[in-house]
Amino acid sequence: MPRSEADTIRILVSTDNHVGYAERHPVRKDDSWRTFDEIMQIAKKQDVDMVLLGGDLFHENKPSRKSMYQVMRSLRKHCLGMKPCELEFLSDAAEVFEGAFPFVNYEDPDINVAIPVFSIHGNHDDPSGDGHYCSLDLLQAAGLVNYFGRVPEADNIHVKPILLQKGRTKMALYGLSNVRDERMHRTFRDNKVRFYRPNQQKNDWFNLLALHQNHYAHTRTSYVAENMLPDFMDLVIWGHEHECLIDPVRNPETGFHVMQPGSSVATSLVPGEAVPKHVAILNITGRKFEVDKIPLKTVRPFVTREIVLASDKRFKGLDKQNNRHEITKRLMVIVNEMIEEANAEWRAVHAEDDDMDEDMEPPLPLVRLKVDYTAPDGARYEVENPHRFSNRFTGKVANHNDVVRFHCNTKGKKNVATAPGVREDIAEILESADTIKVDNLVQEFFAQQSLKILPQAPFSDAVNQFVSKDDKHAVEMFVIESLSTQVKELLQLDDDKIVDLDAHIQDFRQVMEKSFDAGQHKQAQRTKRFKRKPDGWDSDLDGHWINQPQALEDIPAEVEPKGNDRPTKRVPTSGVTFSDEDEDMDMDNQPVPIRAAPKRGAAAKTTAAAKKAAPGKKAAPAKKAAPAKKAAPAKKAPARGRKKKTPFVDSDEEEEEDYPEDDDEEEEEADEEEEDVIMEDDEEDPPAPPPKPKATSRVASTRASARATPVRATPARATQARLRLRRPPKPGLLARRLG
């Protein structure tokens, strides 16, 4: 197909931006967000159709307000505008996007999006905590990012594409967000990863996959091999690896190309980070693509070098006593050479800038010198303290605390992991012996003392979230959820059938363990979402769309595909299952189970306190005022009327029970405050109207609310039972009370 602008999809590709990295460093605090802003400027200047981010947009799971502000500022400044987006969205948005707004942002009539941004999450900004939200959920709710590639169940992954078309070019965009590498490797091995393909003209689609996993085998199972991915892919954008290998490389076994854009900011001073940083402009026309590399100019220059004193001619003859001063002097010369090299590289990158000032000074570079000071037999190299040596370059480098790294191979010490004859599995264990994992610590703890009520596997996961993701409420929410679930299960048992309560608790704990191991234990999901606003809706005349009852709809429960119900064309050996059947891309015809309305427990009973309460609001007795102080206003008690319907149903709110107030306690408080009561109203309260019957199912309640016309409730009249007035008493009344 000949290339033309009308048929070419232009995509800016970037991964691992790590906004917020070293934001408390006095020199490097603004490096990450400045480079991300440059990337968004490039997207606008190059007039691309979309931006694809491959994970780790933020460096932390809970980014700071500064980081979130800078990202939202860049996205709003460079990606919003009046330019129409030429990409035609062909997918069912409800299948690829989740959340309150299940549609692509550039089709939202309330937002003018010129350059849509599509992103998956990485291992640094992954979802966690109550509700299973991440920072990308906030950006999606703000209409700035299209968050796709979610993995609700790590042991049963379904990857559905975003179908886009421009002219005659069709693209299927697949997203696979980060999952712990060992678990992802096991899921691929067990053929539990299923990729869906378009059911029409599947040979006309350009298949693009973005994923965020280890690319290389750090250990036996802590990576995803390229041959595990489906061979119908045309290009794979590989995130998580920070070395910039922007040129696509073809895999001869699978036939697709792999591009590794790398990070846009150096987060570790290793040789892979010293490779010049780039972003790519991907031009797709039909089934062919081209890549244009664009260097990033706001990246801080970085130079690394490694020397061995025993083999370096500049340090010949210094392997003797009292040689520290001379070694330090010659090492300082090498570091100064590296600083000049870094500054020269920065000037070369900015040589073609028309707006660059000749007197402009380059930023302080990053310099890392690794020194092996292992001496021959009978000799010795004396080196200076690395921190003291690094501080000599304060004001010359950005990393003035860790410029040099000294290491020495101790005599007689051998690397057992790399010794010949050592089995591969034993070497793997020896290499990871110094790595302490939270999961291992929890398992060792439970091996000595077992749990009776709480399940062990979810407990270990909650502790891992607390330590790794800084989720301060992970353990608390786990305990509350586990105990409440077990209490509900025990209350459903018949009293005459309960023989051994401990046995029931043990059985249910094992059920929760198996559910978690099978990947069925998930966070509470949202059950309602907003419909798309009709084209003819006028907010000024008809009111805000989100305030209308018909704007809400139930989120259909996803039906798990069964292995025997959907035969596939073939079962690939790569550990991936994909399907070409028509029903695989059409999930709307599946039956949706109807959940019964939760019981309200004690709230369904009529109590004495409920009889006193008015239909609308209830006045609470005023607090007892301290002497010589002005009486405090009465505290407003919670309303006893019908609870206002919210857009989302929280599982905690569904199970919350309303308990009647204890009238005896109110009477006792009134007796204690008798000395402060001047006048009392003995008028009896009018009886409350009978309670309205409740809906028997959630579906019925939803349909009823959709048909009903919203009417503002009139404020209910409440009679105050006891009036505590602070006006001076009448002389006659006071005399009768004293008499």
Curated annotation (Swiss-Prot):
Signal peptide extent: none
Acidic residues bias locations: 650-686
Binding annotation for Mn(2+) 1: D16, H18, D56, H242
First-listed, main subcellular location of the protein, grouped into a coarse class: nucleus
Cofactor requirement: Mn(2+)
Domain of life (superkingdom): Eukaryota
Binding site for Mn(2+) 2: D56, N123, H212, H240
Gene3D superfamilies attached to this UniProt entry: 3.60.21.10, Mre11, capping domain (3.30.110.110)
GO biological process: double-strand break repair via homologous recombination; double-strand break repair via nonhomologous end joining; meiotic DNA double-strand break formation; mitochondrial double-strand break repair via homologous recombination; mitotic G2 DNA damage checkpoint signaling; mitotic intra-S DNA damage checkpoint signaling; telomere maintenance
UniProt biased composition (Basic residues): 523-532, 637-646
Compartment(s) of residence: Nucleus; Chromosome, Telomere; Chromosome
Compositionally skewed regions (Low complexity) per UniProt: 599-636, 694-722
Role summary: Core component of the MRN complex, which plays a central role in double-strand break (DSB) repair, DNA recombination, maintenance of telomere integrity and meiosis. The MRN complex is involved in the repair of DNA double-strand breaks (DSBs) via homologous recombination (HR), an error-free mechanism which primarily occurs during S and G2 phases. The complex (1) mediates the end resection of damaged DNA, which generates proper single-stranded DNA, a key initial steps in HR, and is (2) required for the recruitment of other repair factors and efficient activation of ATM and ATR upon DNA damage.
PANTHER family assigned: DOUBLE-STRAND BREAK REPAIR PROTEIN MRE11
NCBIfam families: mre11 (TIGR00583)
The protein's name: Double-strand break repair protein mus-23
Source species: Neurospora crassa (strain ATCC 24698 / 74-OR23-1A / CBS 708.71 / DSM 1257 / FGSC 987)
Gene this chain is encoded by: mus-23
